[in-house]
Curated annotation (Swiss-Prot):
Pfam families for this protein: KOW, ribosomal_L24
Keywords of the record: Ribonucleoprotein, Ribosomal protein, RNA-binding, rRNA-binding
Function noted in UniProt: One of two assembly initiator proteins, it binds directly to the 5'-end of the 23S rRNA, where it nucleates assembly of the 50S subunit.
InterPro entries per the UniProt record, alphabetical: KOW, Rib_uL2_dom2, Ribosomal_uL24, Ribosomal_uL24_CS, Ribosomal_uL24_KOW, Translation_prot_SH3-like_sf
Source organism of the structure: Synechococcus sp. (strain JA-2-3B'a(2-13))
An annotated Gene Ontology molecular function: rRNA binding
Gene that this sequence comes from: rplX
Name used for this protein in its record: Large ribosomal subunit protein uL24
GO terms for cellular component: ribonucleoprotein complex; ribosome
Family membership: Belongs to the universal ribosomal protein uL24 family.
Amino acid sequence: MVRPLKPSQIRRLVRRPGIRKHRNSLRYKMRIKQGDTVQVISGDDKGKIGEVLRVFPERNMVLVEGVNIVTYHRKPQREGESGRIETKEAPIPVCKVMAYSKKQEVASRIGYQITADGRKVRVLKKTGEILD
């Protein structure tokens, strides 16, 4: 006779995509930082410009203001409370955004340069504008 599996055993068998939780989880090198202005270069929101609100290096994703808006239908939590519809930004892969220069209104890749005082700074390759 075969015994049914416990929920904890089922969880171990089913592989779920997502973040690895152990200490040595993979972190991607992010050239885009929080507060940068970026332009979306592919996908449904192509051409939109926004500020990076948050960076997720372990998932290789960024949260951009006004981009990838998702809708949540919330059930009422307490008696007498009505349900509601919420909209908010969802993260998008960092490969779908490019740093954007507000001065010259052009998107560009990011490079690095050593300044005269020895600091390593991020630079827009098309315009030469320093980001840091």
